[in-house]
Regions:
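Terminal, non-globular segments
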Residues: 1-181
Length: 181
């Protein structure tokens, strides 16, 4: 069959802005949650909360919208986390890139599973990332650090994930079907 050149209307500015907003939403929400967690409120465990929010956001969006959570975007979120946090530069970047890699690698299996299994896998990934961050920080600062903050970070991440996943799932569903939002 012969293909005839057709006339296609140009995409409107509103349509292009809508597509850009949908594409950037996962990165923007993760960055905004990271900034909100970094506000100086004087809460105990606020550094662990900040790292937990970044881990949960990157894991969730890498699992359910990997096209919008590219490694470069994860790198920039990790750089923001390093600039806002207390760890040596590069620790947050490396841990978030590894979390992203695990989520993308296991995506096909995990997206078909129930929430409890995804939560369990996230808790294991968050615990591994916390141990990695603790170890890298100890090596880069040449000090043996107490393991308590790493344990607290893993527990906060595991406890925070259901609430964040609920909010991010609602946002994800409204992105997928804007007419029902």
């Amino acid at each position: 069959m012969e293909r005839l050149p057709g006339i296609r209307p140009r995409e409107s500015l509103g349509r292009r802005l809508d597509m850009a907003a949908r594409w950037s939403f996962p990165a923007a929400t993760t960055a905004l949650l990271l900034l909100a967690a970094a506000t100086p409120l004087g809460l105990p465990g606020q550094a662990e909360l900040q790292a937990s929010v970044a881990l949960a956001g990157v894991f969730f969006w890498s699992l359910f919208r990997p096209a919008a959570m590219l490694p470069l975007v994860v790198f920039l979120i990790g750089l923001l986390a390093d600039l806002l946090g207390y760890a040596p530069p590069g620790v947050g970047v490396l841990s978030l890139l590894l979390v992203h890699g695990v989520a993308v690698r296991w995506r096909r299996l995990l997206t078909r599973q129930g929430f409890l299994l995804v939560w369990f896998v996230f808790a294991a990934v968050a615990a591994t990332a916390a141990v990695l961050q603790w170890g890298l920080t100890a090596v880069l600062t040449w000090r043996l650090l107490p393991p308590g903050p790493a344990l607290l970070q893993a527990l906060v991440a595991a406890g925070l994930y259901p609430a964040l996943a609920t909010l991010l799932t609602r946002a994800h569903l409204s992105l997928a079907a804007p007419e029902s939002a």
